[in-house]
Amino acid sequence: MTNIRKTHPLLKILNSSFVDLPAPSNLSSWWNFGSLLGVCLAVQILTGLFLAMHYTADTATAFNSVAHICRDVNYGWLLRYLHANGASMFFICLYLHVGRGLYYGSYTYTETWNVGILLLFTVMATAFMGYVLPWGQMSFWGATVITNLLSAIPYIGTELVQWIWGGFSVDKATLTRFFTFHFLFPFIVAALVIVHLLFLHETGSNNPTGIPSDPDMIPFHPYYTIKDILGFLIMLTALSTLVLFSPDLLGDPDNYTPANPLNTPPHIKPEWYFLFAYAILRSIPNKLGGVLALVLSILILAIVPILHTSKQRSMMFRPLSQCLFWLLVAVLLTLTWIGGQPVEHPYVIIGQTASVLYFMILLILMPLISIMENKLLKW
């Protein structure tokens, strides 16, 4: 008798995606981050659902409702900090996942890559709106500053900002709609994840060598299921350690002060995972230019497949490209550090240099080095 997992209409979809899926035999731990992101999304949706049961999206009570969750709700403090630090874990996994794609040439699967970029934008939008909800000082001023950037759009900018705010400033209407969208977006993310996997399973996974692995495939279960479970345990251990020992390590102390439109914090900055983009935004002294650079800092990923000039897919056997890749990582870490610093010398010039380097590496140096490596192959 045929196994039910191969005949049942629902189970056979799951079977072909997670059990009998042919996978390359040489996938390294860098391929774990896709499944880790799935776990992060599940944790965020579950903790968020329970938090939403106790949260009130009203300027008068939002801050107090978060305090109430932490003090009076059973394990409310755990839910709140799992959700806040879960977002940090989500972005760590996201950036490592994208970095893996860049390093091993996974972006040549353009449909999967483009859906991935769309996912990145959606998750970033969700995280930004979530940061506004506790209605602390940094929530309020972060929302004001970032939404205000849209006023740089010619002709329709000001009207667009007021339309998003639902008034002439960030207020009750803004908080209510941000809560609505923050609740909705994770489900859109979940739908996009299915599309992402659909496109991935059309082509099959890439592998560290970048060479087609059709002759040497192994079933996903048990080999990669057990490997993924190990990844889950390591990540959940790290998350638990963060939540239970230093839950406020990655947060901003200003967010423990209720939002006050009459008092501006000395340094307005977003959560740590947006600091690199924020540094790029700040490094351009023109408002519209800064906004364009901010959007392009992520959107540039969409043209990476077009700029792929190498005859080899992966960077595994391309030492010069590897050096450039790690320089790019160093530049991004520098930008993250600069984003959290005040706008003064020498931080301004460091940020501007790092921003120029970031775009230069991706747009000019990577394609040129790849062409050079192609020539070296002939020698």
UniProtKB/Swiss-Prot annotation:
Other noteworthy facts: Heme 1 (or BL or b562) is low-potential and absorbs at about 562 nm, and heme 2 (or BH or b566) is high-potential and absorbs at about 566 nm.
Name of this chain's protein: Cytochrome b
Q: Taxonomy-wise, where does this protein's organism fall, top ranks first? A: Eukaryota, Metazoa, Chordata, Craniata, Vertebrata
Q: What's an example GO BP annotation here?
A: mitochondrial electron transport, ubiquinol to cytochrome c
Entry binding sites for heme b b562: 83, 182
Name the gene for this chain: MT-CYB
How this chain sits in the membrane, per its record, is: Multi-pass membrane protein
Q: What does this protein do?
A: Component of the ubiquinol-cytochrome c reductase complex (complex III or cytochrome b-c1 complex) that is part of the mitochondrial respiratory chain. The b-c1 complex mediates electron transfer from ubiquinol to cytochrome c. Contributes to the generation of a proton gradient across the mitochondrial membrane that is then used for ATP synthesis.
Q: Which residues cross the membrane?
A: 33-53, 77-98, 113-133, 178-198, 226-246, 288-308, 320-340, 347-367
A Pfam family reported for this protein in Swiss-Prot or TrEMBL: Cytochrom_B_C
